[in-house]
A protein has these predicted regions:
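Core catalytic lobe of class I
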Residues: 1-195
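S-adenosyl-L-methionine
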Residues: 201-214
Length: 214
């Protein structure tokens, strides 16, 4: 059911994307699929297979390095000091980057990068992005601004529209506001909608007051 939902959502996104549109999807490498017994699945691979089936073209995978990781499950319960069934836990996530038909942008626009911030560009193209875990528990799955900010800088013009079909607490929208991008956020939960709207409005209000002050 989950995979059918993912295919339905990203099929609709594929339909409305321009031929040179990009998709950047933050996802765990692996997740549990059994409540017990150590069963895990390579989620990133399964999601990519769905995207490829839809028609997306693969570009790259960015490894996300959490600089302040939460405590991981390091014990191998049920096989302590034994190779019978050790539980190896990989908490890492990635960003799968793909495009519709054309990787090099046909449409022209204004880049975030220039000579003054070229070191930032070089850091991002290395393929490993550092991020700090989000400590504010706004929703069940809110994430750090350190993830959408570099993705938007790297893969969009300032004139582009950024779409987030799982808007949640509005982190992508907030990142777009910080970078001067237009954005669209889709969220079914009214509670999450309210959280996102308040969060972004508060940021915009602060920025406006700063401009008025100076």
């Amino acid at each position: 059911e989950y995979y059918e939902f993912i295919e339905d959502v990203f099929s609709k996104i594929y339909y409305i994307m321009p031929d040179d549109g990009r998709l950047a999807l933050n996802i765990p490498y692996e997740v549990n699929y059994k409540k017990s017994g150590g069963g895990r699945t390579f989620l990133a691979s399964k999601i990519w297979n769905i995207l490829e089936k839809i028609g997306y073209q693969y570009s790259t995978t960015i490894d996300l390095n959490e600089t302040s990781p939460h405590k991981s499950k390091l014990t191998a319960w049920g096989s302590w000091l034994s190779p019978s069934a050790p539980y190896v836990y990989n908490p890492k996530e990635c960003v799968i980057v793909c495009y519709k038909k054309v990787w090099k942008r046909i449409t022209k626009g204004t880049s975030y990068f220039n000579e003054s911030n070229k070191k930032e560009f070089i850091k991002y193209v290395a393929g490993v992005w550092d991020y700090r875990a989000e400590t504010q528990k706004l929703t069940e799955a809110n994430y750090s601004l350190d993830i959408p900010l570099p993705a938007i800088k790297m893969f969009s013009w300032k004139e582009d529209i950024v779409l987030d079909p799982f808007f949640g607490s509005g982190t992508t929208g907030l990142a777009c506001e910080m970078l001067g991008r237009r954005w669209i956020g889709i969220e079914l939960s009214e509670n999450y909608q309210n959280i996102a709207v308040k969060r972004i409005k508060d940021y915009v209000k602060i920025q406006r007051s700063k401009k008025e002050f100076f």
